[in-house]
Amino acid sequence: MKLLSVLALSATASSVLGASIPVDTRAEKFLIELAPGETRWVTEEEKWALKESGQDFFDITDEEVGFTAAVAQPAVAYPTSIRHADAVNAMIATLSKENMQRDLTKLSSFHNRYYKSDYGKQSATWLQQQVQAAITASGANRYGAKVASFQHNFAQHSIIATIPGRSAEIVVVGAHQDSINGRSPMTGRAPGADDNGSGSVTILEALRGVLQDQTIVQGKAANTIEFHWYAGEEAGLLGSQAIFANYKQTGKKVKGMLNQDMTGYVKGMLDKGLKESFGIITDNVNANLTKFIRMVITKYCQIPTIDTRCGYACSDHASANRNGFPSAMVAESPIDLLDPHLHTDSDNISYLSFDHMIQHAKLVVGFVTELAK
């Protein structure tokens, strides 16, 4: 139970008993994990201060009593060769930078997408409508494809699109949908174009591409496919933690999860004299899944890779990993060259490359198809 709930009960009792019981007016506190086994109780303001200092964390306040984080990498076999090049290339040919620019213009127009705000709720509702439209336009809904809200104890909901396959084993692609202004989290302007509007519209356009394949649309792929848009990532990976904890509790099988968090900024690399590249995260990920992703990139994308590390609890793939599911992350660049405008009111479309975002969309289409079909 959160301290806030305790305070609410105390306040009720105080009014009933004529204020004979003192009310604790201390700020609500949250239990965070900064490294395996390293926990701390902090206020909301202290959470944001840690975030702005570059310290990521899991918010585990609502974690089930007795939860044990996974410590071993799941033993999962992945394809060692490309098997669906014709199908993937046909899907890739349908990907549209114009769609991505249109969607990101709208998504970044909300005042912010803060997980506790009405704006965060409104943006999630709009995004879910776009996902539903893509499913309906493809006809996949006639074969069981659907999109659903995953509700939390805050305003913004997560979104899960499901395309059934012949087995219940799931291939997941995810991106967080929320945004934050580091100086004024509650009310500040936070367009979040790159962090993480870019990842959100990247996987949305990849979903449209995947839904061009009739084998997948008609539920004939070997595995089930899910696209996730997570709420509350900035506050401690809240949405993805809740989803993957639920999957663990209900015995779901996840073959692999690919996270897309920030997919549009290349200037940092170019200013350093580097080639435009993907940033392949190598820590807190599944090594075999990452090896498979490298193969997909080599086949379907036109830019190279650079290995990089992002630390503990840096993004939503860490939630999958913590719950025992194999996960990986590919970022827009090495972590030290990410978009410097993140968490500010200047995180705008004008700094982004839609050519680079298309490369990420190609990766997602290739990943999903080669692993699920």
From Swiss-Prot:
Keyword field: Aminopeptidase, Disulfide bond, Glycoprotein, Hydrolase, Metal-binding, Protease, Secreted, Signal, Zinc, Zymogen
Residues annotated for Zn(2+) 1 binding in this entry: 176, 195, 261
Annotated compartments: Secreted
Propeptide: 19-75
Ligase listed as a keyword: no
Cofactor note: Binds 2 Zn(2+) ions per subunit.
Record-level GO cellular component terms: extracellular region
Biological process annotations from GO: proteolysis
EC supergroup of this enzyme: hydrolase
Purpose of the protein: Extracellular aminopeptidase that allows assimilation of proteinaceous substrates.
Name of the protein in question: Leucine aminopeptidase 1
Organism: Arthroderma gypseum (strain ATCC MYA-4604 / CBS 118893)
Gene name for this UniProt entry: LAP1
